[in-house]
Amino acid sequence: MVRSAMLEISINGQPRQFDAPLSVAILLEREGLSGKRLAVEKNGEIVPKSRHAATPVEAGDRLEIVVAVGGG
């Protein structure tokens, strides 16, 4: 039986674990955030929405995810 590796990453300063392989798009889907207006920063660099599917998440990565909230 083959087990996928566990990735240890940080999301908004909180340690988390996910099965590998993982992209930003898959991470957002697993977190229930796909389709929302948000910004993703990976290790200090903004990840454009057009690159979410192609951007891998790797062990030790630090992600900041900010969800836009409407209001006034």
Give the location of each predicted region.
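Ubiquitin-like/PB1-type beta-grasp interaction modules and other compact soluble beta-rich domains
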Residues: M1-G71
